[in-house]
Amino acid sequence: MPMWLGILVGVVALVAGVALGFFIARKYMMNYLQKNPPINEQMLKMMMMQMGQKPSQKKINQMMSAMNKQQTK
């Protein structure tokens, strides 16, 4: 096998592996987000109501900002 053919096969295999890995990771993340959607303000309001708290917009904003700060760490 000539040297250039070996290099070409290696590069093609590498590109194919990267592309396949990207699509597998994308599919996994889409399924994960479908099963576990991120918490939004409406969900937070419902959780507070279920816990017996009266959800004010100020409390919801404080909790959302605290959750966003925690995620960025």
Swiss-Prot record:
Residues in coiled coil: none
Keyword Cell membrane: yes
Signal peptide region: none
UniProt entry keywords in alphabetical sequence: Cell membrane, Membrane, Transmembrane, Transmembrane helix
Keyword Cell membrane carried by entry: yes
Topology of the protein relative to the lipid bilayer: Single-pass membrane protein
TM region(s), chain numbering: 4-24
One cellular-component annotation, GO: plasma membrane
Cellular compartment(s): Cell membrane
NCBIfam families in UniProt: PRK01844.1 (NF002503)
Family: Belongs to the UPF0154 family.
Protein name, UniProt field: UPF0154 protein BcerKBAB4_3367
Organism: Bacillus mycoides (strain KBAB4)
